[in-house]
Protein backbone atom coordinates (compact mmCIF):
# COMPACT_ATOMS: atom_id res chain seq x y z
CA UNK A 1 0.00 0.00 0.00
CA UNK A 2 1.26 3.45 -0.89
CA UNK A 3 0.92 5.31 2.40
CA UNK A 4 0.35 8.86 1.17
CA UNK A 5 1.12 11.66 3.63
CA UNK A 6 -1.89 13.72 4.65
CA UNK A 7 -1.95 17.23 6.08
CA UNK A 8 -5.06 17.94 8.15
CA UNK A 9 -6.03 21.58 8.64
CA UNK A 10 -8.18 22.42 11.68
CA UNK A 11 -11.00 24.96 11.63
CA UNK A 12 -11.60 28.03 13.76
CA UNK A 13 -10.97 27.35 17.48
CA UNK A 14 -10.05 23.74 16.68
CA UNK A 15 -7.06 21.61 17.64
CA UNK A 16 -6.03 18.19 16.33
CA UNK A 17 -8.90 16.76 18.42
CA UNK A 18 -11.14 17.80 15.50
CA UNK A 19 -9.54 14.88 13.61
CA UNK A 20 -9.02 12.49 16.53
CA UNK A 21 -11.07 9.67 15.04
CA UNK A 22 -9.69 10.13 11.53
CA UNK A 23 -6.10 10.06 12.82
CA UNK A 24 -6.86 6.74 14.51
CA UNK A 25 -8.64 5.35 11.45
CA UNK A 26 -5.81 6.29 9.08
CA UNK A 27 -3.00 4.86 11.21
CA UNK A 28 -0.13 3.97 8.88
CA UNK A 29 -0.39 7.17 6.88
CA UNK A 30 2.08 9.89 7.87
CA UNK A 31 -0.21 12.63 9.26
CA UNK A 32 0.59 16.26 10.00
CA UNK A 33 -1.70 18.79 11.64
CA UNK A 34 -1.27 22.26 10.18
CA UNK A 35 -0.57 25.20 12.50
CA UNK A 36 -3.53 27.56 12.18
CA UNK A 37 -2.90 29.63 15.31
CA UNK A 38 0.29 31.57 14.53
CA UNK A 39 -0.77 33.63 11.51
CA UNK A 40 -3.39 36.29 10.84
CA UNK A 41 -3.91 35.55 7.14
CA UNK A 42 -5.03 32.51 5.18
CA UNK A 43 -2.08 32.97 2.79
CA UNK A 44 0.43 32.95 5.67
CA UNK A 45 -1.22 29.82 7.10
CA UNK A 46 -0.94 28.14 3.68
CA UNK A 47 2.70 29.20 3.29
CA UNK A 48 3.53 27.84 6.76
CA UNK A 49 1.83 24.55 5.87
CA UNK A 50 3.80 24.28 2.61
CA UNK A 51 7.11 24.99 4.39
CA UNK A 52 6.41 22.17 6.84
CA UNK A 53 4.77 19.61 4.52
CA UNK A 54 6.42 16.80 2.54
CA UNK A 55 7.01 17.35 -1.20
CA UNK A 56 3.72 15.67 -2.14
CA UNK A 57 0.75 15.19 0.12
CA UNK A 58 -3.01 14.85 0.39
CA UNK A 59 -4.93 17.60 2.10
CA UNK A 60 -8.06 17.88 4.17
CA UNK A 61 -9.50 21.00 5.74
CA UNK A 62 -12.69 21.73 7.63
CA UNK A 63 -14.29 25.20 7.61
CA UNK A 64 -11.40 27.67 8.00
CA UNK A 65 -9.18 24.69 7.23
CA UNK A 66 -10.93 24.50 3.88
CA UNK A 67 -10.10 28.16 3.18
CA UNK A 68 -6.45 27.33 3.85
CA UNK A 69 -6.67 24.19 1.68
CA UNK A 70 -8.01 26.23 -1.25
CA UNK A 71 -5.14 28.68 -0.80
CA UNK A 72 -2.62 25.80 -0.78
CA UNK A 73 -4.19 24.61 -4.04
CA UNK A 74 -3.69 28.12 -5.45
CA UNK A 75 -0.08 28.49 -4.27
CA UNK A 76 1.28 24.99 -4.96
CA UNK A 77 -1.19 22.80 -6.88
CA UNK A 78 1.64 20.57 -8.12
CA UNK A 79 2.35 19.36 -4.57
CA UNK A 80 -1.21 18.30 -3.72
CA UNK A 81 -2.21 14.71 -4.60
CA UNK A 82 -5.86 14.98 -3.50
CA UNK A 83 -7.97 17.26 -1.33
CA UNK A 84 -11.03 16.89 0.90
CA UNK A 85 -12.86 20.19 1.43
CA UNK A 86 -15.20 19.79 4.39
CA UNK A 87 -17.91 22.12 5.74
CA UNK A 88 -16.31 25.02 3.91
CA UNK A 89 -16.88 27.69 1.27
CA UNK A 90 -15.10 29.21 -1.72
CA UNK A 91 -16.70 32.60 -1.16
CA UNK A 92 -15.38 35.60 0.75
CA UNK A 93 -17.04 36.92 3.90
CA UNK A 94 -20.19 39.01 3.54
CA UNK A 95 -20.33 42.32 5.48
CA UNK A 96 -22.83 40.68 7.85
CA UNK A 97 -20.49 37.76 8.55
CA UNK A 98 -17.59 40.12 9.17
CA UNK A 99 -19.67 42.19 11.61
CA UNK A 100 -20.60 39.00 13.48
CA UNK A 101 -16.92 38.01 13.73
CA UNK A 102 -16.03 41.39 15.26
CA UNK A 103 -18.87 40.89 17.74
CA UNK A 104 -17.51 37.44 18.69
CA UNK A 105 -14.03 38.91 19.20
CA UNK A 106 -15.55 41.53 21.53
CA UNK A 107 -17.41 38.80 23.44
CA UNK A 108 -14.19 36.78 23.75
CA UNK A 109 -12.35 39.78 25.19
CA UNK A 110 -15.22 40.65 27.57
CA UNK A 111 -16.36 37.21 28.71
CA UNK A 112 -13.56 34.82 27.75
CA UNK A 113 -13.07 32.27 25.02
CA UNK A 114 -15.12 29.60 26.79
CA UNK A 115 -18.19 31.84 26.63
CA UNK A 116 -17.74 32.18 22.86
CA UNK A 117 -17.33 28.43 22.46
CA UNK A 118 -20.49 27.69 24.44
CA UNK A 119 -22.35 30.28 22.36
CA UNK A 120 -21.15 28.70 19.11
CA UNK A 121 -21.83 25.13 20.26
CA UNK A 122 -25.56 25.63 19.79
CA UNK A 123 -25.03 26.13 16.05
CA UNK A 124 -22.02 23.91 15.40
CA UNK A 125 -23.65 20.49 15.66
CA UNK A 126 -26.91 18.98 14.47
CA UNK A 127 -29.61 18.14 17.04
CA UNK A 128 -29.20 14.46 16.13
CA UNK A 129 -25.50 14.42 17.03
CA UNK A 130 -25.45 16.91 19.92
CA UNK A 131 -24.23 15.55 23.24
CA UNK A 132 -22.68 16.92 26.41
CA UNK A 133 -19.46 15.03 25.62
CA UNK A 134 -19.19 16.55 22.14
CA UNK A 135 -19.89 20.05 23.47
CA UNK A 136 -17.16 19.64 26.09
CA UNK A 137 -14.65 18.56 23.42
CA UNK A 138 -15.50 21.68 21.40
CA UNK A 139 -15.09 23.93 24.46
CA UNK A 140 -11.77 22.25 25.37
CA UNK A 141 -10.41 22.87 21.87
CA UNK A 142 -11.42 26.54 22.02
CA UNK A 143 -9.79 26.99 25.43
CA UNK A 144 -6.57 25.47 24.06
CA UNK A 145 -6.52 27.95 21.15
CA UNK A 146 -7.11 30.94 23.44
CA UNK A 147 -8.20 34.50 22.75
CA UNK A 148 -5.16 35.73 20.80
CA UNK A 149 -5.18 32.68 18.53
CA UNK A 150 -8.91 33.20 18.01
CA UNK A 151 -8.40 36.86 17.05
CA UNK A 152 -5.68 35.94 14.52
CA UNK A 153 -7.92 33.26 13.02
CA UNK A 154 -10.91 35.57 12.74
CA UNK A 155 -8.74 38.22 11.06
CA UNK A 156 -7.55 35.62 8.56
CA UNK A 157 -11.13 34.55 7.85
CA UNK A 158 -12.34 38.15 7.47
CA UNK A 159 -9.56 38.95 4.97
CA UNK A 160 -9.67 35.67 3.06
CA UNK A 161 -9.79 35.86 -0.73
CA UNK A 162 -12.79 34.79 -2.75
CA UNK A 163 -11.73 31.62 -4.59
CA UNK A 164 -14.81 31.30 -6.84
CA UNK A 165 -12.94 32.07 -10.07
CA UNK A 166 -10.20 29.55 -9.26
CA UNK A 167 -12.37 26.48 -8.69
CA UNK A 168 -12.54 25.54 -12.37
CA UNK A 169 -8.71 25.49 -12.58
CA UNK A 170 -8.25 22.84 -9.86
CA UNK A 171 -6.84 19.67 -11.41
CA UNK A 172 -6.37 17.32 -8.43
CA UNK A 173 -9.00 14.83 -7.21
CA UNK A 174 -11.28 16.76 -4.84
CA UNK A 175 -13.96 15.47 -2.49
CA UNK A 176 -16.38 18.09 -1.16
CA UNK A 177 -18.11 17.11 2.08
CA UNK A 178 -20.93 18.90 3.90
CA UNK A 179 -23.49 18.25 6.61
CA UNK A 180 -27.02 18.77 5.37
CA UNK A 181 -27.88 20.44 8.71
CA UNK A 182 -24.84 22.78 8.75
CA UNK A 183 -26.05 26.04 10.33
CA UNK A 184 -22.69 27.83 9.91
CA UNK A 185 -21.93 27.39 6.19
CA UNK A 186 -24.90 26.61 3.91
CA UNK A 187 -24.61 23.14 2.31
CA UNK A 188 -25.38 24.94 -0.95
CA UNK A 189 -21.73 26.12 -0.97
CA UNK A 190 -20.61 22.49 -1.16
CA UNK A 191 -22.91 21.85 -4.10
CA UNK A 192 -21.53 24.94 -5.87
CA UNK A 193 -17.93 23.84 -5.30
CA UNK A 194 -18.55 20.28 -6.43
CA UNK A 195 -20.35 21.50 -9.55
CA UNK A 196 -17.48 23.84 -10.49
CA UNK A 197 -14.33 21.88 -9.61
CA UNK A 198 -13.62 19.48 -12.51
CA UNK A 199 -14.32 15.86 -11.53
CA UNK A 200 -15.12 16.72 -7.91
CA UNK A 201 -17.01 14.19 -5.82
CA UNK A 202 -19.79 15.43 -3.50
CA UNK A 203 -20.60 13.78 -0.17
CA UNK A 204 -23.63 15.17 1.69
CA UNK A 205 -24.11 13.82 5.22
CA UNK A 206 -27.73 13.75 6.46
CA UNK A 207 -28.60 14.96 9.98
CA UNK A 208 -25.08 16.35 10.35
CA UNK A 209 -23.93 19.85 11.27
CA UNK A 210 -20.70 21.82 10.86
CA UNK A 211 -18.37 19.66 12.99
CA UNK A 212 -18.80 16.64 10.76
CA UNK A 213 -15.51 14.90 11.59
CA UNK A 214 -16.65 14.75 15.23
CA UNK A 215 -20.34 14.19 14.51
CA UNK A 216 -19.89 11.40 11.92
CA UNK A 217 -16.41 10.04 12.60
CA UNK A 218 -16.75 6.69 10.83
CA UNK A 219 -18.34 8.12 7.70
CA UNK A 220 -15.79 10.94 7.48
CA UNK A 221 -12.88 8.54 7.97
CA UNK A 222 -14.22 6.38 5.14
CA UNK A 223 -14.46 9.44 2.86
CA UNK A 224 -10.85 10.40 3.69
CA UNK A 225 -9.70 6.83 3.08
CA UNK A 226 -11.22 7.02 -0.40
CA UNK A 227 -9.55 10.40 -0.99
CA UNK A 228 -6.18 8.91 -0.01
CA UNK A 229 -6.76 5.98 -2.38
CA UNK A 230 -7.31 8.50 -5.20
CA UNK A 231 -4.11 10.28 -4.15
CA UNK A 232 -2.15 7.02 -4.25
CA UNK A 233 -3.62 6.12 -7.65
CA UNK A 234 -2.98 9.57 -9.11
Residue ranges and their predicted role:
Residues 61-65, 69:
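Gly/Ala-rich beta-loop-alpha elbow adjacent to hydrolase catalytic centers
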Residues 183-189:
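Conserved alpha/beta-hydrolase "acid-adjacent" motif
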Residues 93-96, 111-168:
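Conserved alpha/beta-hydrolase catalytic His-Asp/Glu region
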Residues 191-210:
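Catalytic histidine neighborhood in serine/cysteine hydrolases
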Residues 170, 176-178, 182:
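Short beta-strand/loop motif that positions the catalytic acidic residue
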Residues 1-48, 62:
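Conserved HGGG/HGGXW glycine-rich cap/lid loop of the alpha/beta-hydrolase fold
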Residues 208-221:
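Catalytic histidine-centered segment of alpha/beta-hydrolase-like enzymes
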Residues 74-75, 79-118:
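Flexible "cap/lid" loop of the alpha/beta hydrolase fold
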